[in-house]
Every structure is written in structure tokens, then in C-alpha cells.
């Protein structure tokens, strides 16, 4: 059913071609294609710097893995988020933009910071552009685990 032939690889549950994946994010349907995004450590089979992988399917069973949609940057790794199709160009980014909302997690400094960011595609998910004015929501001064 899929392109995978390894004996222990799931055939009805998406898995990446290589390395470690975390939770799926932002399943969205657009122009007859399902777009699945997932947290992906491209360096190892364990937890590490998170990218957002991207796979597409017409039937939710047969998946084709695409180039990564998001990669770590100065704001940190790419954590959980969602996707929407902006049919009415409410964002002003362009007609029928696919928009990704994600958490940028900077865990390298002495105080971890988590911000909400956006990225978008104007070519049916082939290429992705991070929003120039990221973050769209900054970390609050008070978190649930400690005061900052």
C-alpha cells in the first residue's frame, strides 16, 4: 500500500523515510491533496532539534514525503502547531495561502522561550516562507511552571 517494504514498518500509519518523528501537526486538505506536517529530528533517532516535515496524500493511506516545510532558526526549534487554508485572503498574504502556525522553542539560553510564529505557502505547499514579522505572539511574562 505504501512505498515502504521493511517488515516492521507500519503500512497504514505515516512514518518518515528516515530518523525520528514526534507528533503530527497541521493536517489540512487543499485542492484535492491532504498535507500532513510532523515534528522531525533529521539528525538522529532520538529527541533533538525539531524541523517540520511535510508529506502529501490523496487518500490518507499512500503518502509521499516532501521537502521540509520548516527548519530551526534563531527563534529555536519548530514545535507544535496547526495549518489553515486562507481561502478569503484574510491574512493579506495571498489568495489561497496555506498558513502554518507553530511554536518556536528556544531552549538554548538560560531561560527557555516559546513564541508563536507563522509561515505560509502560495504554491500549494511546494515552498514555504516564514512570516517576516515573527513572532506573532511573544512569550508571556508569567508561565505555568515558573515566574520570569
Residue ranges and their predicted role:
Residues 33-36, 93-100:
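Entry beta-strands of beta-propeller and related beta-repeat scaffolds
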Residues 57, 119-122:
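Conserved Ser/Thr-centered positions that define the repeating blades of beta-propeller domains
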Residues 4, 38-64:
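Beta-propeller domains
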Residues 23-25, 79-82, 147:
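Beta-propeller and closely related beta-sheet repeat lectin domains
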Residues 53-54, 60, 64-90:
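Blade-loop segments of beta-propeller domains
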Residues 4-14, 60-72, 123-139:
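Blade-edge beta-strand/turn elements of extracellular beta-propeller
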Residues 134, 145-148:
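Conserved small/polar residues in nucleotide/adenosyl-binding loops
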Residues 1-34:
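N-terminal regions that are enriched for targeting/export leaders
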